[in-house]
Every structure is written in structure tokens, then in C-alpha cells.
């Protein structure tokens, strides 16, 4: 490539993506709140029924090339980067085009078997053009990630989200009068526009940096070995992601089916599913702003440490330790606040009080969800894609069995789904942790990773229960009292971490 780009370190890269993800998550959360208020729980339920099938098609089109490209170009020279990028670009262009055409051709079959409400058909058809756009963009994302230029990823995410939110809100508001199905399709159109904006932003940044990854031509003899290496790494990864996406797709079909078995009608089922996926899970994913940034930086960092024979083991241990500790430090207070403030969050933001109890059941398991995501990135960096595949299969089977058994119980309903997710996340975390220990033979300091954050969480909860009666009975309004308690929890948590030394190792 034309210029030598300086890589950004693990902590710096995470910090840059953290800032970007705060903006992206903030915009996305605002967008979700507005959509729920515009479309209602029933409308957002239709959107969420399409999302797992769309995600499955995206993974199928991507062939696992983005993480493969990221790992293969990490620490390599410019000539090899150009070669792998060009090979990845053509794989993704072909994959995205073929999957989109196949989805259009077989859409009646897909809708009949994987989406329980026929009103979501228009939403599904209008989102399909995003598939080739996302596929092509993943080549640039994998290249930037492998070079550890994560700031470029952050800029493109911001552009993508800003366009999606602006187009989505404007178009949904204008199409509400045309009916719920048409208004729901506006969210799909907004997704297509946002992904296109993100792709254009990535291309512009690459050209602005003086990099021309497609400028140098390569012969078929040069490209074929690169294609084979990309697919050799990416296809097992695709299998794992396809299984994860297939599980989400089956989950989106199985939950409404089990709720129907438990006695709810079609409209009630769609509304309940909207509360679960559109409200409760949206809030649960909000604290993931940090872990999302962390996982993007961890994969190439772990891959690079594996290449350094002399100091690789110590560096690998430190990076795995730091990533787990950082995930724990940021996840615990987030889950605590969601558990304590589920009622006001669901009522004030979404005007959907019934979703609060679902969120309370999901919050404890959310801790293991975020740790599982972090460990999955570590395993990707180690190249243990087959292990990830087996772990995904096992935890997915447990999830689907739990949903089928628990959600069908009239006394549990959608709460059974939440419990099944908690069990599945715990299982996935334990499987990933065991795999990391087995593959790396390193020892982790769980006193720093979990002990100190748990201590800080316990102290914060104790202070909360002491202060709550005093603040509630004071002259403060209920909203002001809740805000004061929230600040008190965060302040106590941070202070306890500082005193116990729970933050001193997070310096990179």
C-alpha cells in the first residue's frame, strides 16, 4: 500500500472505538426509542422478526472473510496486504451478489418457514439490497482492523448510524398513514441508506490516506493461494457464525410459536416479542458500547502476540487478562443499573412498562453474555475457529431446548425465554473460558478480573440500599432522586475500584 500506517495500540484503539461506539449506541438507542414510540411494540416486533433472517444472510454472504482478512494482514507488509485485500474484495462481491439473488428467488419459502407474521414480508424485501453493500464494506473493515486503524471504523460507523437514523425517522413518520406494514418497511430502507453511507465513508478514508488497495493488479496464480487462505480461515468461522445466526433465526421463529402454544394470539405474540427483542434486549445491549470496541481491538492484538515467539506468551497472557478485566469492570455496573432501574427505563423511554420484568430477568445473565463475547474474540485471534463452532453448537442447543421447554409454560411465557438466554450465556462463557485455558496454558488472576469488580458492585449496592430511603423521602422529585442514586452508585463503584486497585492494570 502506498503509505505505511502506524498501528494503534490495544488501549488506544479500544478508546477510539469506545468514543465512536458511545455516539453510535447513543444514536441507535435514540432511534430505537423513537421507532418503538412510532410503531408500537407490535411494529417493532415485525422489525425484529426480520432481523435474524437478515443477519443469517449477511453471515452467509460474508464467508467469514472480514475476521480472516484482519488476522492475515496483521503485522504483514504492504504487498501482502494488497494481495489479501484484493482476494477478499472479489470473494465478498461475489458472495453478496449471489446471496441477494438467492434470497429474492426463494423469499416466499423463507418467509413461510422462518417469519411467523406475514406482515413482515415488505420489510424483508426492502432490506435485501443492503446485503451486497455490507459484504463489500467488510473488506475495508477487515483491512482497517488488521492494520489496527480502528479510528477509521469508528468514523464509518458514525456516518452509517447518522444516515440510518435520519432517513428512518423521517421516512417512518411520513409513511405511518399508509399502514403499519409500510411504515415498518421504512426501517429497512433506512438500513440500506445507512450501510451505503458507511461504505462510501470507508472508501473515502482509504483513498484520503493515500492507500489504493485495488490499484495493483494480480494474476490468478497470485490470487488463488490468497483466496484459499482466506477461505481456509473464514469458512470455519462462517460455519460458527452461521450456526449462531441460525440459532437467532430459529429463536425468532420458536419464541412466537411457543407463546402461541401457551395461549396468546398472533397480535399479542408479535407485541410480546417486540417487548422482548425491541425493548428489553435493546436496553441490555446498551452497556456493550465498551465491549464492542474492545473485541475489535482484541482480535488483531492476540493474533500479533501469537507471532512473537520470544515474548508472545507473556504478552498474550496480559492481553487476555486485560480484556477480561476491562469487560468485567464496565459490564457489572451496567447490569446493576439495568436491574435496579428496569421499571423507569422501560416506562419513561419506551412507554412500555411490561418489558421491565423481562429486563430484570435478563440483566444477571448479561454479565456472562459480555464476557462470552470478549472471549470469543480472543479465540478468533488464536485461530480456534473450530472450537468456537463447537461451543456455539452446544450453547445454541441448550438455548433452543430451553426456549421450547420454558416459553411454552403458561406460568412463564416470555420470562422462560429470558431464563433460557441466561443459561445459554453462562454455558457459552464457561465453554470459551475452558477453551482459552486449554489452548494457551496461561493462568489468569481472577482476583483482579472478577473479585475487585464484584466487591465494588457489592459496596455500591449496599450504599444504594442505605441511601434510597433517605433520598426518596427528601424534597427531591422521584426523577431527581433516581438520578442522584445512579450517580451515587457509579461514584461508589469507581471509588471502590480505585481504592482496591481494580483499575491499575488497565493502562494499555
Q: What is the meaning of each model-derived region?
A:
Residues 1-27, 221-241, 505-508:
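N-terminal membrane topogenesis motif
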Residues 151-152, 162-201, 205, 386, ...:
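Membrane-interface helix-loop junctions in multi-pass transport and translocation proteins
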Residues 116-139, 336, 340, 351-375, ...:
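Alpha-helical transmembrane segments of multi-pass membrane proteins
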Residues 96-242, 246:
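Hydrophobic transmembrane helix module of multi-pass membrane transport proteins
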Residues 134-156, 364-394:
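Membrane-interface junctions at transmembrane-helix termini in multi-pass inner-membrane proteins
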Residues 62-77, 284-314, 320-324:
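Helix-loop junctions and terminal segments of transmembrane helices
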Amino acid at each position: 500500500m502506498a503509505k505505511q500506517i502506524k498501528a494503534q495500540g490495544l488501549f488506544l484503539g479500544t478508546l477510539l472505538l469506545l468514543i465512536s461506539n458511545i455516539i453510535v449506541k447513543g444514536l441507535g438507542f435514540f432511534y430505537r426509542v423513537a421507532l418503538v414510540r412510532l410503531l408500537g411494540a407490535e411494529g417493532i416486533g415485525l422489525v425484529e422478526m426480520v432481523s435474524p433472517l437478515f443477519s443469517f444472510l449477511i453471515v452467509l454472504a460474508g464467508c467469514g472473510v472480514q475476521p480472516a482478512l484482519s488476522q492475515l494482514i496483521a503485522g504483514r507488509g504492504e504487498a501482502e496486504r494488497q494481495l489479501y485485500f484484493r482476494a477478499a474484495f472479489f470473494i465478498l462481491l461475489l458472495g453478496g451478489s449471489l446471496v441477494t439473488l438467492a434470497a429474492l428467488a426463494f423469499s416466499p419459502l423463507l418467509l413461510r418457514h422462518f417469519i411467523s407474521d406475514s406482515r413482515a414480508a415488505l420489510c424483508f424485501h426492502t432490506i435485501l439490497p443492503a446485503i451486497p453493500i455490507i459484504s463489500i464494506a467488510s473488506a475495508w473493515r477487515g483491512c482497517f482492523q488488521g492494520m489496527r486503524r480502528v479510528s477509521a471504523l469508528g468514523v464509518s460507523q458514525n456516518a452509517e448510524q447518522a444516515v440510518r437514523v435520519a432517513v428512518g425517522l423521517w421516512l417512518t413518520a411520513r409513511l405511518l398513514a399508509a399502514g403499519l406494514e409500510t411504515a415498518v418497511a421504512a426501517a429497512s430502507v433506512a438500513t440500506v441508506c445507512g450501510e451505503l453511507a458507511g461504505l462510501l465513508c470507508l472508501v473515502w478514508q482509504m483513498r484520503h490516506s493515500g492507500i489504493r488497495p485495488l490499484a495493483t493488479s494480480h494474476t490468478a496464480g497470485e490470487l488463488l493461494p490468497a483466496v484459499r487462505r482466506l477461505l481456509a480461515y473464514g469458512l470455519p468461522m462462517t460455519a460458527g457464525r452461521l450456526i449462531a445466526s441460525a440459532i437467532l433465526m430459529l429463536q425468532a421463529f420458536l419464541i412466537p410459536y411457543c407463546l402461541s402454544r401457551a395461549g396468546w394470539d398472533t397480535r399479542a405474540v408479535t407485541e410480546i416479542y417486540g417487548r422482548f427483542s425491541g425493548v428489553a434486549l435493546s436496553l441490555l445491549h446498551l452497556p456493550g458500547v465498551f465491549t464492542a470496541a474492545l473485541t475489535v481491538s482484541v482480535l488483531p492484538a492476540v493474533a500479533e502476540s501469537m507471532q512473537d515467539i520470544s515474548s508472545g506468551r507473556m504478552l498474550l497472557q496480559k492481553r487476555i487478562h486485560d480484556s477480561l478485566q476491562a469487560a468485567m469492570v464496565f459490564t457489572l455496573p451496567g447490569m446493576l443499573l439495568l436491574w435496579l432501574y428496569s421499571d423507569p427505563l422501560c416506562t419513561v423511554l419506551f412507554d412500555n412498562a411490561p418489558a421491565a420484568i423481562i429486563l430484570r430477568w435478563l440483566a444477571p445473565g448479561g454479565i456472562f453474555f459480555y464476557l462470552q463475547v470478549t472471549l470469543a474474540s480472543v479465540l478468533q485471534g488464536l485461530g480456534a475457529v473450530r472450537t468456537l463452532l463447537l461451543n456455539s453448537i452446544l450453547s445454541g442447543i441448550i438455548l433452543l431446548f430451553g426456549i421450547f421447554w420454558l416459553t411454552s409454560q403458561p406460568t412463564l411465557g416470555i420470562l422462560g425465554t429470558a431464563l433460557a438466554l441466561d443459561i445459554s450465556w453462562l454455558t457459552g462463557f464457561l465453554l470459551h473460558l475452558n477453551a482459552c485455558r486449554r489452548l494457551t496454558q496461561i493462568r489468569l488472576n481472577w482476583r483482579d478480573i472478577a473479585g475487585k469488580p464484584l466487591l465494588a458492585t457489592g459496596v455500591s449496592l449496599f450504599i444504594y440500599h442505605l441511601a434510597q430511603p433517605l433520598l426518596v423521602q427528601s424534597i427531591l422529585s422521584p426523577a431527581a432522586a433516581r438520578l442522584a442514586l445512579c450517580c451515587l452508585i457509579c461514584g461508589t463503584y469507581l471509588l471502590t475500584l480505585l481504592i482496591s486497585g481494580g483499575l491499575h492494570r488497565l493502562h494499555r
